[in-house]
Amino acid sequence: MALVVATIFHWKRSQGQVESARQGLKARQRAVAQELAPRWLPMRQAVEAWTIELGRGAEVEPFVDAEAARHWDFRDKAGLYLRLSIEQAADVAAIRAGAKKSLRDGFTACLLRAPNESPLVGKECARTRDCGVGESCNELDRCARPAQPYNLRVAYRSLQVLSDEWVRDTDNAAGELELRMLTSSFEDTVRDDLPIAVDLLTRAQYFLLVLDEAPSGAPPVVGDAGVGDDAQLTAPHWARVGLWRLSDRKLVLRMRTEASATLVGGATVTDADVAGARQRQANSCALAGAVRRVIEGADAQPAP
């Protein structure tokens, strides 16, 4: 009997400690949210609304703000970037799921003039804490200064601690070990990732969006396949591009054009993966060239 009583007492004591730790972690999260949510949530709401708007309907009315294009060259400025399939622009949930796999690609490299260093030159890392001041641990597990434009995938990941989902995960943590893991992740994010994310979001002057349509005859992208669906980007396809100036929420560019290029010359490539990567790069650069021509004064290409 004494053993049973002792066991119950120990269990209740452990549960009390877990609950105390849970409430302490949630209090720390509320303090962070109180400071950062007013900066992040309005911007997130704006870019998600723009993304849904650009993806809506079968037609896209071409638009260029001539004055902004003439006097405000965004290509050497700090900005935000997101690339999704058009199916992932259907609603907020789809955008957030797709953003988890959105990466910088040949489109930004060919369009913008940001002096980014190679993502492979830094030392190996497991998390941002392993890197120097101003550096983060990138998707290649290398320390590097955040590249421009800043991919919204990283912002969504870093600022996940402000979300209702994070609070639910904390409420549902079953025991001490799970709560310790959440606490450790929270501390790493607050110490290492949030300062960089907030700085880049604060400095951003534009939002650049690409929505890839499915190639003719191809099945639509579903779930969180995102721009990582290589087959979609390798084939010729139509894409929608939007550009917004963040200071006044002004639409600067809206267009739909074909992302398609023919590789000419060079050595014959027999490796299918290498050939596919080259074709994706060429298609993305062709898309960037079309955007550049519109910005420089050409008419937006009408939809077929």
What do the predicted segments below correspond to?
Residues 1-10:
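Hydrophobic membrane-insertion alpha-helices, especially the h-region
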Residues 10-122, 145-178:
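A structural "domain/chain start" motif
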Residues 44, 238, 288-292:
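Extracytoplasmic/secreted envelope proteins and their assembly/folding machinery
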Residues 124-136:
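Disulfide-braced loops of extracellular cysteine-rich modules
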Residues 134-146:
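Short, disulfide-bonded extracellular cysteine-rich repeat modules
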Residues 150-152, 159-160, 165-166, 175-247:
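Surface-exposed short loop/turn segments
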Residues 247-298:
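Short secondary-structure boundary motifs at beta->alpha junctions and helix caps
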Residues 302-304:
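Short, solvent-exposed mixed-charge patches
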